[in-house]
UniProtKB/Swiss-Prot annotation:
Record EC number: 7.1.1.-
Keyword Translocase: yes
Topology term for the membrane: Multi-pass membrane protein
Keywords assigned by UniProt, alphabetized: Cell inner membrane, Cell membrane, Membrane, NAD, Quinone, Translocase, Transmembrane, Transmembrane helix, Transport, Ubiquinone
Organism name: Laribacter hongkongensis (strain HLHK9)
Role this protein plays: NDH-1 shuttles electrons from NADH, via FMN and iron-sulfur (Fe-S) centers, to quinones in the respiratory chain. The immediate electron acceptor for the enzyme in this species is believed to be ubiquinone. Couples the redox reaction to proton translocation (for every two electrons transferred, four hydrogen ions are translocated across the cytoplasmic membrane), and thus conserves the redox energy in a proton gradient.
GO BP: ATP synthesis coupled electron transport
Family recorded in the similarity comment: Belongs to the complex I subunit 4L family.
Record-given protein name: NADH-quinone oxidoreductase subunit K
Chief location category: membrane
Subunit and interaction comment: NDH-1 is composed of 14 different subunits. Subunits NuoA, H, J, K, L, M, N constitute the membrane sector of the complex.
GO terms for MF: NADH:ubiquinone reductase (non-electrogenic) activity; quinone binding
Gene Ontology CC: one annotated term: plasma membrane
A Pfam family hit: Oxidored_q2
Amino acid sequence: MLTLTHYLVLAAVMFAISVLGIFLNRKNVIVLLMAIELMLLAVNFNFIAFAHYFGDTAGQIFVFFVLTVAAAESAIGLAILVVLFRNLATINVEDLGQLKG
């Protein structure tokens, strides 16, 4: 039987992997977006684990709101990525400094 601690350790490992992915990869925008999404999924995993452990549905409902915001963030991030690739022909984060408004 899996306890709450198992779920929290798994979520902490997922969160640590995503933070490590953000710090180690500073070049590719797609990998950065994937790491941020993994971070949000780890937080959602914690919400679901606590909601199941305490028998409350508020955590599960809050996950739907977080997933909605994450989907919007992904859509906006990918739209910005397409515009960057059209203008600069690259998706490197280092080249974002060339954008002038």
